[in-house]
Structure formats: structure tokens, C-alpha cells
Design a protein with these regions (language model features):
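Sec-dependent N-terminal signal peptides
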Residues: 6-15
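Prokaryotic Sec-type signal peptides and long signal-anchor helices
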Residues: 14, 19, 82, 132-134
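Generic secondary-structure transition motif, activating predominantly at the C-termini of alpha-helices
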Residues: 15, 43-47, 82-86
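Short, low-complexity N-terminal intrinsically disordered segments enriched in polar/charged residues
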Residues: 20-56
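Short, solvent-exposed loop/turn elements at domain surfaces
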Residues: 50, 70-71, 153-156
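Short solvent-exposed beta->alpha transition segments
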Residues: 53-105
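Exposed beta-sheet edge and beta->alpha loop/turn motif
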Residues: 101-157
């Protein structure tokens, strides 16, 4: 009888441990495969750009699709683009919100509303493509394929 109780306890512990491991794996896999998470990382890098420009640039550039990098690169040119009109309006943004407007198996489009550091309010369209990860060619991840220039609203906040 005592052996049976220990066996049941052992099986419960093994089952619980396997569930936790599965949930952790699933969560981390989802983190890598959700375009919303990538977009949040990128926008948070824009939000804190001045506090660590090199890290922010590495994050933003790291999630750029190879086609995007070909057009906007090399990285030094990409940085110059970020620091000049109209894209510098996104740097050090105060707040943002986004809505997914298009969703396909390999492409997601977001409408992003941004409150800039100067209190102007604008939106951009951000387009991701699910493609081969630059850091790990055996995996696919969401990469920025395009970002529109800011479209300003009539009045700020």
C-alpha cells in the first residue's frame, strides 16, 4: 500500500514537471514566433534609444529583413537614416499602441500610433515577414520588411 502511494506521488511529480517544461518550451517558442513580441522589442528600443543608442540600434537592425538591410544598409547608413527626417520622430517616443491590420501565414502588418517626445501624434505602418532568422538559419522569425514614413495627425496631445 505504501509503495502504491509513493508510485502515485512519483507519477504526479513527473507529470507536473513535464507539464511545466512543456509550458516553458511552448512559451519561449511562442515568444520567438509572435510578431507582436518582436514589434514590442523594437518599439521599446526606439522608446529608450538615447539611453543606449548602440543597443537600440543593434536590436532594430537585428530584426530587419535581409531585403530591408540591402536597401537601408550597411548598418552605419541605417543609423544615419534613423537619425534623420522623417524617421527620427520615432526615436525616444513617449507612448505607442498598435493594431494588427493584416495577418497571413508569412506576413503581418501593424498600424502603430505613436506619441513622439515633442508631443506630436502620428502613425506608421510596420510590415513583418516570417522568414529565415539571420542568427539561426534553421529557424524562422518575424523580420521587418518595411516601415512607412510617419503620417501626422492634425493636433498633438
Amino acid at each position: 500500500m505504501l509503495v502504491k502511494k509513493y508510485l502515485i506521488l512519483f507519477l504526479v511529480l513527473v507529470f507536473c514537471n513535464n507539464n511545466i517544461s512543456s509550458q516553458e518550451t511552448t512559451t519561449s517558442d511562442l515568444d520567438l514566433q509572435q510578431s507582436e513580441n518582436v514589434l514590442t522589442q523594437i518599439l521599446d528600443s526606439y522608446k529608450t534609444y538615447s539611453s543606449d543608442p548602440e543597443e537600440a540600434l543593434d536590436t532594430i537592425w537585428g530584426f530587419a529583413h535581409p531585403s530591408n538591410k540591402e536597401i537601408t544598409g550597411p548598418k552605419e547608413n541605417f543609423e544615419k537614416m534613423l537619425l534623420s527626417e522623417p524617421y527620427n520622430a520615432i526615436l525616444d517616443l513617449k507612448e505607442y499602441s498598435f493594431t494588427k491590420t493584416v495577418e497571413t501565414e508569412d506576413s503581418n502588418h501593424y498600424e502603430i500610433k505613436i506619441l513622439a517626445k515633442n508631443n506630436s501624434y502620428f502613425e506608421v505602418i510596420w510590415v513583418f515577414q516570417f522568414d529565415e532568422c539571420p542568427d539561426n538559419p534553421k529557424e524562422n522569425c518575424w523580420l521587418t520588411i518595411a516601415v512607412t514614413a510617419p503620417s501626422y495627425y492634425e493636433s498633438g496631445v
